[in-house]
A protein has these predicted regions:
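N-terminal cap/lid segment of alpha/beta-hydrolase-fold proteins
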Residues: 31-59
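Short, surface-exposed "cap/lid" segments of acyl-processing enzymes
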Residues: 59-62, 66-94
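Conserved alpha/beta-hydrolase
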Residues: 86-111
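Conserved acidic catalytic loop of the alpha/beta-hydrolase fold
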Residues: 124-141
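Conserved hydrolase catalytic core segment
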Residues: 141, 146, 150-177
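Alpha/beta-hydrolase
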Residues: 184-263
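Conserved alpha/beta-hydrolase "acid-adjacent" motif
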Residues: 269-275
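Catalytic histidine-centered segment of alpha/beta-hydrolase-like enzymes
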Residues: 296-307
């Protein structure tokens, strides 16, 4: 697989808004350092027990820690795909970052409350304890955060709740005031399923024909993804979708001063393109950027070009001075 530099991605964009940084100085450093894997739990002030996985560089640490927050359809695992060079966690850790991925409430090995109690506000409240624990373990005062899809709304709410703990922020495939018209029917179906009595967790169906909504991909990676979702995340909390449609993070966008990158694929079908532009314009932070990765869909983690673009762009933003 060809490794693309962030510079190359930016040059090939159909459009990009950049504020406060020069494209030409972005290095493409080699991935060489060894990493240590850790798995642990954090009991939050909100009463949740959340599982975290960490990848810590054995040497060459840059003194920065980041937290990766998943979206609605799968837990933490797509940040660490164990096939060839698809792991975002490995890539970032080998370049010197302390990398943590959380399993949010309602998912995987973490506490599963009533599914209607899983939303951006409750999850952001949980993550305050997580961010504090990460800061303690890594010896930093602030933690960078990346959130995918509904995880973006979680980050916005977190940036409003405890901005003093958030270093830099990346919103990947995260809607703002509306979702893409192509995704409305599926979102509506999920919301309606959650209205049935006793259905606070609903079937997760989005993964079944995911290859129809991907840029060039490797069969074994897509097969891995489908197997993981089917075996570990076959049900998802019913509270996520109705909350995401309302997006409690909307008021935070214009208020936040946290440096923020909006990162989408050019073939996004969850994020509406004009909505993404509106969010960029409304962002209150003077240090902000929007990058569109050519050919990428919503799940760029499992795409050949998309995974490489995510890795290098994320490293750039989290280490930008």
């Amino acid at each position: 697989m060809k490794r693309w530099s962030v510079k190359g991605w930016m040059i090939s964009l159909s459009f990009v808004f950049i504020t406060g940084f020069a494209v030409a100085v972005i290095p493409s450093a080699a991935v060489t350092a060894e990493v240590e894997r850790q798995e642990f739990y954090v009991t939050t002030d909100t009463g949740m027990k959340l599982m975290l996985v960490a990848k810590i560089p054995a040497s060459g640490r840059l003194g920065k820690a980041i937290l990766l927050v998943h979206g609605s359809g799968v837990g933490w695992v797509y940040w660490d795909i164990p096939i060839r060079d698809y792991s975002i966690m490995d890539y970032l850790a080998k370049k010197g970052l302390d990398v943590y991925a959380v399993e949010c409430r309602g998912y995987g090995k973490s506490t599963k409350p009533n599914g209607m109690e899983v939303n951006a506000t409750t999850t952001a409240s949980d993550l305050k304890s997580v961010v504090k624990e990460i800061a303690k373990r890594s010896g930093v005062s602030k933690v960078g955060m990346a959130g995918h899809s509904s995880g973006g709304a979680i980050l916005l709410v977190a940036a409003g709740m405890y901005p003093e703990l958030v270093d830099r922020m990346i919103l990947i495939g995260a809607p703002y005031k509306k979702i893409h018209p192509n995704f409305v029917a599926y979102a509506t179906k999920v919301i309606e399923m959650g209205k049935e009595p006793g259905k606070d967790y609903v079937p997760n169906l989005h993964y079944r024909d995911v290859e129809k909504r991907l840029d060039a991909y490797d069969d074994d990676v897509v097969a891995w993804y489908k197997k993981v979702v089917e075996e570990q995340y076959g049900l998802m909390p019913a509270g996520v979708y109705p909350d995401a449609m309302k997006n409690p993070g909307i008021p935070i966008v214009s208020m936040t001063k946290v440096p923020t990158l909006i990162l989408n694929g050019s073939n996004e079908y969850v994020v509406d393109p004009q909505d993404a532009l509106d969010m960029f314009k409304d962002l209150g932070s003077p240090d902000k950027a929007m990058i569109i990765l050519p050919g990428g869909y919503h799940l760029m983690f499992i795409e050949r070009r998309g995974s490489a673009g995510l890795q290098e762009t994320m490293f750039f933003w989290f280490t930008k001075k």
